């Protein structure tokens, strides 16, 4: 998949997840220079996150820093997790729809 800038809706969800994070605050450079890549998750909406300077580098899962859930348009619950790598840099925004279906829409959240 190709790298791209996050959409406004993805940015709003990232902002919410960062605000809910336990003992984690990304650097301003990591947040403003962030690129994303859609993960091959069957259309559930998960993103691999690439702060500046991380593309092409070996990175590993560090920890989950926040969780949240919302209902998709069809009423099916979607669980969201923000994950950082072992160096505490943004790593993945994981979305999991409980029926394994495709995400219909990200939640409507106010943009910053």
Regions found by a protein language model. Give the residues of each.
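Short, compact, well-ordered microdomains
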Residues: 71-112
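N-terminal domain-onset segments
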Residues: 1-67, 104-112
């Amino acid at each position: 998949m190709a790298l791209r800038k996050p959409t406004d809706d993805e940015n709003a969800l990232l902002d919410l997840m960062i605000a809910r994070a336990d003992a984690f605050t990304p650097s301003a450079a990591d947040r403003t220079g962030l690129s994303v890549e859609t993960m091959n998750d069957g259309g559930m909406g998960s993103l691999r996150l690439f702060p500046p300077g991380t593309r092409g580098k070996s990175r590993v899962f560090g920890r989950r820093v926040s969780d949240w859930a919302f209902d998709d348009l069809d009423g099916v619950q979607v669980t969201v997790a923000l994950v950082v790598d072992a160096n505490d840099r943004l790593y993945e925004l994981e979305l999991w729809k409980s029926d394994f279906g495709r995400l219909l829409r990200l939640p409507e959240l106010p943009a910053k």
